[in-house]
From Swiss-Prot:
This is Uncharacterized protein TP_0226. It is a multi-pass membrane protein. Keywords: Cell membrane, Membrane, Transmembrane, Transmembrane helix. Its main location: membrane. The keyword DNA repair does not apply. Coiled coil: none annotated. It is found in: Cell membrane. It comes from the Bacteria. The chain crosses the membrane at residues 37-54, 67-89, 104-126, 138-160. Pfam families: CbiQ (PF02361). InterPro entries: ABC/ECF_trnsptr_transmembrane (IPR003339). One of its GO terms (cellular component) is plasma membrane.
Length: 228
């Protein structure tokens, strides 16, 4: 994954100027907020060029492409299954909508991974990545060459989707409490947990399909309580 970065990391840290760290961090912020096709294309070219200059290899980019491909395959499967079980039919228009949503998520995730790789290569001490090393020790994995890349991927995914998950959690937990407060039996607790998980997944998929909804401030409506 990040093996080509590890090979040159020690030499890079000694000669990387502060402007490289600032530039890599600025690229990371730009990748988080890129929305247009032109911005995506220009950032992709810049990141590919910088990755080739810094690492003399594109192995890490190939690893990022594999990760994004696996995630998009999982994303499309969930979207199609959700559409089929909701409406019973999967039309060409719905498939095109899923492809459009998958493009935006996939390209932003790819840019985010590439930018985080460069930021990691140009930065010597960072609390985020020291936390990743601690995670590896907790998992009892001796080789940090395997632990750190996996932890970084998990961190980037959490940062990418963490805001939506946290917002939905704070809203839907009141629904979960309302359903369990009426009856404290084990069956009712399991039913409320499954309903909460299903509603959370549905709302996250809806936000992924409509990027404009990510900035909206939603409130849980009362009809969710009486949906079943």
């Amino acid at each position: 994954m990040f093996f080509s970065l590890y090979e040159r990391r020690q030499s890079l840290l000694h000669r990387a100027p502060p402007v490289a760290k600032v530039a890599s961090f600025a690229l990371l912020l730009l990748c988080c907020n890129a929305q247009s096709w032109c911005m995506h294309a220009s950032l992709t070219l810049v990141l590919l060029a910088l990755t080739l200059i810094v690492t003399r290899s594109l192995k890490c980019v190939a690893a990022h492409i594999r990760v994004v491909s696996i995630y998009l395959a999982f994303f499309f499967s969930l979207k199609i299954l959700h559409t089929f079980f909701s409406t019973g039919v999967v039309s060409a228009t719905q498939i095109n909508q899923h492809i459009h949503a998958g493009y935006h998520i996939g390209i932003r995730l790819f840019l985010l991974l590439c930018a985080s790789s460069l930021f990691y290569a140009c930065t010597s001490r960072l609390e985020l990545f020291s936390l990743c090393l601690r995670m590896g020790k907790v998992l009892h994995v001796r080789s940090t060459a395997y632990t750190t890349p996996c932890a970084v991927y998990v961190m980037m995914l959490v940062l990418y989707f963490g805001h939506d998950i946290f917002r939905e959690w704070t809203e839907l937990r009141f629904v979960w409490r309302a359903r369990t407060r009426a009856n404290t039996s084990f069956y009712n607790w399991v039913d409320a947990t499954l309903h909460f998980s299903k509603t959370l997944l549905t709302r996250l998929l809806e936000r992924a399909q409509h990027p404009s909804l990510r900035r909206a401030d939603f409130k849980v409506s009362d009809n969710i309580l009486s949906s079943e």
